[in-house]
């Protein structure tokens, strides 16, 4: 009983979306083989899911359904519309990309797209909205009619050619009706068919021309079709009659126009924006305008030499009006999404439009069919689960017998072992933090896609011309290679996801504990730490020959000290602090050391930034540090200088002020003894650099001797 209630609730909800004439769900394209760079046919679709509460977060699986034998009486059932059909005694193997929620009584299968073992490929559907006047004459059959949720699982197991698939759909609609208006694509290595389901029992399908391309969203686009050309057209017998009976029959240039006779009177804003964007992206010189009353389905590029690649169609499905600066994607506007309840068809701000690469995409796919490959291969599907904005397209042959485990995960919420949830999370982070990631994530995938495209082309060349028998014999080796490759790519996805999570955590931690940066203007030395706000830094640049333990080596030495700004009291120790020191552009750094009170030097771990010409290390003490170079350099004796930098409490880019004064002490004496260790925060006498109140006895001694010598010199002068 509960399942029945849920099922009818879903039906009512779906109907409310359909009748609203505003459904932001799915965009499709076709490019004939005469217009592609490699002579392949390409078609595909983005499956959008704008429905609350998920709104673009709806897990999709990618699976292979093995060939099966059924007993008499076995029935295929659609949970959404109640469509049923007897299973055949034997049904073919096929792949599909279903919803994870299938089979729970509240959600249909929605297999989306796939190949079967005979090389038939299919994507279903781009939902289309029939005109209300037509629906009064030929209503949709929402109880028992054929609809999107079951189409893939009904057609692919039963047909051996694309035409057979169209004929099966047509026959079923004649007998049982259609639950929805739909656009469907079926292909094999010989031909591709484009089919529009126009109302409860009306439809027209055409064999797609090899020299045309098409872009279509959630409405109808077929113009005049020669309904008598049965070799290239499959149509319901009453398609003109129903339009006339509905008083919605339209002619253009004296010929029956299918789309204008079955469409709503005007394109929905979301349909117009996507189709216009797609046409102008693929054909920049087109004369089409945004306000055109009709967008023709069959198109030729204005430039007769224009040819399209995989990268072009990936860019099409990712497009966010980058080539149309007058528009912005409406998912940036923070407004109610069009299509949620049908009440927001016209955007409040006309700048914001519904994009092809929108936030609601849950599954994008590109099918590439090459007639050089055996039919058993089907072709290649480039699968882009999740939003297209920041997720990669990964290639799979139609001949595979299994898919990687991460594609089968059926979690309804984030699961780290799910391919869908991983890429969805990557897109979410990239989209919500464009200031952090920019286009870096997309560019990473595009670089990998270049490699995969080249690799796939090599594989296609190897398999071209194989007999069907030889091709079938390769199914398992190819599957094993595909599983291994999927594992490798999934680990790349997880690594990127982990890096992004860590980056955002670092930023969040920084906001909670903002790092203050002190920079000494005279030397360019800077230190960074969350707790420098009330401190000042004093830097003494030492004479080049002042550290005896480094005698004969080329180095720069600095005495870095901290004190409280309020009372000038020296600070002896601080938590881990990053110190950055500029280095000579013409020399290579050998090591970084600090000098302890005894004049001994100890090596530090450091990192180099060749572009900025700096080195950085982490310490919790402040004393004398030296950057030692590998090659001896000409040194000049300069006077030591001291500069003081006062801390400020803003972020890492804080500008500070410096006051330069003459030094009051000389550098520490240095011995010839050298030891090597890694700095730690543990305080050990004679090993860690002295700081603040731990005043160097050597420096005090040198100072006292200097004062005594000065006293006697002055006294001697007075006597003279």
Task: Describe each PLM feature range.
Residues 705-720:
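C-terminal membrane-anchoring or membrane-association module
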Residues 512-515, 519-522, 544-598, 631-633:
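Proteolytic processing hotspots in large secreted/extracellular or virion-associated proteins
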Residues 628-691:
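C-terminal low-complexity, Ser/Thr- and acidic/Pro-rich disordered "stalk" regions positioned immediately N-terminal
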Residues 26-147, 168-308:
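A contiguous strand-loop segment
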């Amino acid at each position: 009983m509960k399942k029945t209630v849920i099922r009818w609730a879903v039906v009512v909800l779906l109907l409310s979306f359909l009748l609203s004439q505003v459904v932001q769900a799915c965009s499709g394209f076709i490019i004939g083989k005469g217009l592609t760079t490699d002579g392949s046919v390409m078609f595909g679709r983005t499956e959008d899911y704008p429905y609350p509460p998920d709104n673009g977060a709806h897990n999709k699986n990618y699976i292979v359904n093995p060939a099966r034998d059924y007993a008499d009486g076995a029935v295929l059932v659609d949970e959404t519309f109640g469509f049923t059909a007897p299973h055949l005694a034997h049904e073919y193997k096929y792949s599909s990309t279903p919803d994870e929620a299938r089979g729970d009584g509240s959600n249909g299968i929605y297999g989306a797209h796939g190949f079967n073992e005979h090389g038939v490929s299919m994507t279903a559907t781009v939902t289309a909205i029939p005109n209300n006047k037509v629906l009064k004459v030929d209503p949709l059959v929402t109880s028992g009619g054929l609809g999107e949720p079951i189409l893939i699982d009904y057609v692919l197991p039963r047909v051996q050619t694309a035409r057979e698939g169209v004929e099966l759909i047509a026959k079923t609609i004649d007998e049982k009706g259609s639950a929805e208006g739909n656009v469907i694509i079926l292909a094999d290595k010989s031909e591709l068919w484009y089919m529009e389901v126009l109302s409860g029992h009306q439809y027209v399908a055409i064999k797609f021309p090899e020299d045309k391309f098409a872009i279509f969203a959630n409405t109808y686009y077929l113009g005049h079709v020669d309904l008598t050309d049965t070799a290239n057209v499959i149509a319901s017998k009453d398609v003109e009659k129903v339009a006339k009976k509905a008083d919605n029959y339209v002619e253009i240039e004296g010929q029956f126009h299918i789309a204008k006779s079955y469409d709503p009177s005007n394109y929905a804003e979301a349909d117009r924006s996507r189709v216009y964007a797609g046409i102008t992206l693929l054909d920049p010189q087109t004369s089409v305008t945004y306000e055109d009353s009709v967008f023709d389905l069959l198109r030729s590029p204005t430039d007769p030499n224009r040819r399209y690649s995989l990268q072009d169609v990936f860019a099409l499905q990712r497009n966010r009006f980058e080539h149309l600066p007058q528009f912005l994607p409406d998912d940036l506007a923070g407004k109610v999404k069009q299509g949620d309840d049908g009440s927001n068809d016209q955007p409040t701000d006309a700048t914001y439009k519904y994009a092809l690469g929108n936030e609601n995409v849950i599954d994008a796919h590109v099918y590439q069919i090459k007639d050089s490959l055996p039919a058993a291969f089907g072709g290649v599907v480039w699968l882009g689960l999740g939003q297209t904005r920041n997720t990669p397209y990964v290639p799979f042959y139609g001949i595979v017998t299994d898919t990687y485990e991460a594609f089968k995960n059926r979690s309804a919420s984030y699961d780290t072992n799910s391919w869908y949830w991983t890429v969805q999370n990557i897109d979410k982070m990239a989209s919500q933090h464009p200031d952090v990631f920019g286009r870096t994530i997309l560019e990473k995938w595009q670089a990998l896609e270049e490699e995969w495209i080249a690799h796939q082309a090599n594989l296609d060349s190897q398999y071209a011309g194989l007999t069907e028998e030889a091709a079938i014999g390769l199914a398992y080796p190819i599957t094993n290679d595909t599983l291994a490759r999927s594992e490798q790519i999934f680990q790349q996805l997880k690594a990127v996801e982990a890096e992004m999570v860590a980056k955002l955590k670092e930023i969040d931690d920084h906001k909670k504990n903002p790092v203050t940066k002190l920079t000494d203007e005279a030397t360019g030395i800077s230190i960074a730490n969350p707790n420098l706000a009330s401190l000042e830094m004093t830097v003494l640049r030492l004479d080049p020959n002042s550290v005896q333990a480094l005698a004969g080596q080329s180095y720069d030495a600095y005495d870095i000290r901290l004190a409280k700004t309020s009372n000038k009291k020296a600070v002896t120790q601080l938590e881990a602090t990053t110190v950055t020191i500029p280095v000579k552009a013409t020399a290579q750094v050998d090591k970084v050391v600090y000098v302890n009170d005894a004049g001994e030097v100890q090596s530090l771990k450091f990192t180099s930034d060749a572009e900025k010409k700096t080195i950085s290390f982490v310490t919790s003490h402040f004393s004398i540090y030296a950057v030692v170079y590998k090659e001896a350099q000409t040194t000049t004796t300069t006077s030591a200088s001291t500069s003081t930098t006062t801390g400020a409490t803003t972020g890492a880019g804080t500008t500070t002020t410096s006051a330069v004064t003459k030094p009051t002490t000389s550098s520490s004496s240095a011995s010839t003894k050298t030891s090597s260790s890694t700095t730690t925060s543990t305080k050990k006498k004679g090993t860690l650099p002295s700081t603040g109140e731990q005043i160097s006895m050597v420096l005090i001694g040198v100072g006292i001797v200097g004062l005594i010598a000065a006293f006697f010199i002055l006294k001697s002068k007075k006597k003279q």
